[in-house]
């Protein structure tokens, strides 16, 4: 994972994308991992465990989060800027900054009202990761939230397929007729350009997607391997 640096703005990597200079190191790889893991846990899953209060839309005060981190050994250096820069450069686009507040925009297992997310720019077709065994049931009963509080749909076949590889060897990708859903009054919200949220996908909007060739990057291969090894250790 690249370092978090600052020059003409925050960025991940060795060189400023504007001038090519190395810039100032804000957080190293270990610090990014620790802060990112904890931030996701607080904003998505269990804020009370960390003594953080979220509002109904999932926002927490940045200053409260920074105070929490600064109580940890070796983290007195943490400032509001560190947290903001981390969120702004997050490669998974998990966070939204609104003034002095921050929230996660997807991945919640707690009940959070995300209906203030944008509803424009929704692709006509969205995608959902499934499996050969699960697909017949999904096509018959539809899609409903399971381990998360919202259904997560992908903007591309590739994104959905790669997401599925974190769980199984050969995902089956389903196509969702998002345009028809919206026309019939079912809300879909845009978390970012890759992830879209809804509360239900009735079966009549679901088909098996036409298969596309997907070539993984080395980074994706390494990340999938890391996550699956971690998950297998929990079994």
UniProtKB/Swiss-Prot annotation:
The catalytic activity of this protein is classed by the Enzyme Commission as 2.7.1.-
UniProt keywords (A-Z) are:
NAD, Transferase
Q: Which GO terms describe its biological process?
A: tRNA splicing, via endonucleolytic cleavage and ligation
Q: Which GO terms describe its molecular function?
A: NAD+ poly-ADP-ribosyltransferase activity; tRNA 2'-phosphotransferase activity
The keyword Metal-binding belongs to this UniProt entry's keyword annotation: no
EC category: transferase
Gene3D superfamilies documented for this protein: 3.20.170.30, RNA 2'-phosphotransferase, Tpt1/KptA family, N-terminal domain
PANTHER family in the record, alphabetically? PUTATIVE PHOSPHOTRANSFERASE, TRNA 2'-PHOSPHOTRANSFERASE 1
**Record family assignment:** Belongs to the KptA/TPT1 family.
The record's function comment reads: Removes the 2'-phosphate from RNA via an intermediate in which the phosphate is ADP-ribosylated by NAD followed by a presumed transesterification to release the RNA and generate ADP-ribose 1''-2''-cyclic phosphate (APPR>P). May function as an ADP-ribosylase.
Put simply, this protein is called Probable RNA 2'-phosphotransferase
Q: Which organism is it from?
A: Thermoplasma volcanium (strain ATCC 51530 / DSM 4299 / JCM 9571 / NBRC 15438 / GSS1)
| Gene name per UniProt | kptA
